[in-house]
Amino acid sequence: MHDANIRVAIAGAGGRMGRQLIQAALALEGVQLGAALEREGASLLGSDAGELAGAGKTGVTVQSSLDAIKDDFDVFIDFTRPEGTLNHLAFCRQHGKGMVIGTTGFDEAGKQAIRDAAADIAIVFAANFSVGVNVMLKLLEKAAKVMGDYTDIEIIEAHHRHKVDAPSGTALAMGEAIAHALDKDLKDCAVYSREGHTGERVPGTIGFATVRAGDIVGEHTAMFADIGERLEITHKASSRMTFANGAVRSALWLSGKESGLFDMRDVLDLHNL
């Protein structure tokens, strides 16, 4: 990677998240907007990326071909869909480009492809790039170690009507953090739906509930409920800019790293807290 400004490419540049990623890239010192990508046939192709994001003219035009921009970026930032992200991943691996991946909804094969690619390129892969959410994940680990063995644990998440995967990647990351702290595998203790005559709650399980409504940016709560008291740890996002800023910060953090798989806790140095 270059010693000067880190040049980033933004996938899905015309989407809500893409536009805010462009704004964040233009605002952070040490980062340069190098390229912007949209799907083939999109009406926004050829538009100035800065103007598209409401940040003024930049001279960076929205392209549809990775080959056309391969010399214009060092790190590729992707918050699109799993199938598109995996195509971008293969290209970045082939050409030695770093990646910041905020896409959610991967199956196990997709996650394994990311792990495999990290042998050759540096990747930050996180379910949520908010600083607050990642601090919350650390708090959940601590709470689970103290309270998890004798409380009922439930995770409730809410997002806008357009979100296509459930539970959210962040909710799953919360469950993983709690399960790991309890020396469990989430797939063995997660309960993703309850309907009809379910019987009493099974001890030691982690329940999930999902809301999809309106324009909710993202709300996540973990509940540790006992008889007579409960602890709730909640994060609420009011703007996607918190995710965009974290993603661009992660791209800058990748400077000088040739390979490896990282998450936001690495970026924020939270692992040792």
UniProtKB/Swiss-Prot annotation:
Keywords, in A-Z order: Amino-acid biosynthesis, Cytoplasm, Diaminopimelate biosynthesis, Lysine biosynthesis, NAD, NADP, Oxidoreductase
PROSITE patterns per record: DAPB
Chemical reaction(s) catalysed: (S)-2,3,4,5-tetrahydrodipicolinate + NAD(+) + H2O = (2S,4S)-4-hydroxy-2,3,4,5-tetrahydrodipicolinate + NADH + H(+); (S)-2,3,4,5-tetrahydrodipicolinate + NADP(+) + H2O = (2S,4S)-4-hydroxy-2,3,4,5-tetrahydrodipicolinate + NADPH + H(+)
A biological process term (GO) from this entry: diaminopimelate biosynthetic process
One GO term describing the cellular component: cytosol
Binding residues annotated for (S)-2,3,4,5-tetrahydrodipicolinate, in chain numbering: 160, 169-170
Pfam families: DapB_C (PF05173), DapB_N (PF01113)
Positions contributing to NAD(+) binding: 12-17, 38, 102-104, 126-129
Subcellular location: Cytoplasm
Active site: 159, 163
GO molecular function annotations of the record: 4-hydroxy-tetrahydrodipicolinate reductase; NAD binding; NADP binding; oxidoreductase activity, acting on CH or CH2 groups, NAD or NADP as acceptor
Subunit description: Homotetramer.
Family membership noted in the UniProt record: Belongs to the DapB family.
Purpose: Catalyzes the conversion of 4-hydroxy-tetrahydrodipicolinate (HTPA) to tetrahydrodipicolinate.
Protein name: 4-hydroxy-tetrahydrodipicolinate reductase
Organism per entry: Shigella dysenteriae serotype 1 (strain Sd197)
